[in-house]
């Protein structure tokens, strides 16, 4: 849905529940649209979301021209999105880096989510602010899904692969010039 503020989209704004959604938002965090998106998906509906570190990291972590280059910042951003999605009732299925960089050269990532079933009422009724507060508690307590050994490994390896491909492309470009 081009030119639509997804944050404010309601179930009655669309004809049917969605089987699938692809999400590519700019100038806003994914955390702002995951609850509305979840409410529009069918049970077992899936989403693939583009994680853009330049819009997830704080301003102090974004470099010149809006580019985030530090692998540690990429890991932090991915952990935040994985933990947030998990905390609002998504199953996080997969993570990979995008083979296409953002316009300024940002490395971006793809996360695959599934709405398994209706969550407990407390999760279903979460407001955006409630979910953000819950995420802060998860991050402070280092207790989220991203802190499990499996996800720590997946996140680390994905970020390492994305940065090694970035280095490879940079070297190829230098050789061509």
Named regions from a protein language model:
Residues 31-46:
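A short glycine-rich, Lys/Arg-flanked "PGG" loop and its adjoining helix->strand segment in the class I
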Residues 52, 105:
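Residue-level signal for inorganic ion chemistry
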Residues 74-88:
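Short alpha-helix
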Residues 6-7, 53-57, 99-100:
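Short "lid" loop at the C-terminus of a central beta-strand within the Rossmann-like core
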Residues 90-99:
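Conserved S-adenosyl-L-methionine
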Residues 53-70:
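Short, glycine-/aromatic-enriched active-site segment of Class I SAM-dependent methyltransferases
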Residues 1-28:
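S-adenosyl-L-methionine
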Residues 107, 111-167, 172-177:
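Flexible, glycine-/basic-rich loop-and-beta segments that form/coincide
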